[in-house]
Amino acid sequence: YHKLKKVLPIIVNKNSWIKPQFVIERVLTKLKENDNLPALLYVFSRKKCNEIAKQISIGLFEEDSKTPAIIRKEAINILRKMPNFKELMILPEYEEIMRLNEKGIAVHHSGISKPFREMQEILFKKGYYKLLVATETMGVGVDMPVRTVIYMSLLKFDGNTFRYVHPHEYAQQAGRAGRRGRDTKGRVI
């Protein structure tokens, strides 16, 4: 406490803060080393979900993993069942999603086109992703259990003002950690 008390004014005065990308990548590296992936990263803004996912520069698969190629092939097979398959494949959103998917990252929020959101839900359930960056809509209704739940913040905008996540919301969201029948415990960061 005393060391922090001395250092904090220096950090504030010099406007020196650790970048969220650095913290997220360090946390993900530790989770990967300790076999605590897949993880769900809650971000309470669609725009921030996309930004954070794009900023993650580390790959979450093993170096010689064939999973990125499998993801692309599986994604095409899923989308091929859609009537507008060819149109979906040429959208910039598709390539953006695939770039993230091939690093083991998926983004899930209401701003993602429904076919791509459903595709990522299927691929997540098959175990292809290591990180799901999502808004709180992921906490309700979609069954995608993970080993670890990470919060970027416990503050969220409720339409009028910023407030802390209510206990029942936290319990619902954090309850994703620990896969029933597979994990003895879940982690919340």
Question: Where are the regions that the model predicts?
Answer:
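Conserved C-terminal RecA-like helicase domain
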Residues: 2-9, 25-28, 42, 46-131, ...
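Short linear interaction motifs
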Residues: 17-33
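Inter-lobe coupling/hinge region of RecA-like P-loop helicase motors
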Residues: 34-37, 103
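Residue-level preference for the first positions of well-ordered beta-strands
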Residues: 38-40, 131, 187
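H-loop/switch region of ABC-family ATPase nucleotide-binding domains
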Residues: 135
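Conserved segment of the helicase C-terminal RecA-like domain
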Residues: 144, 148-189
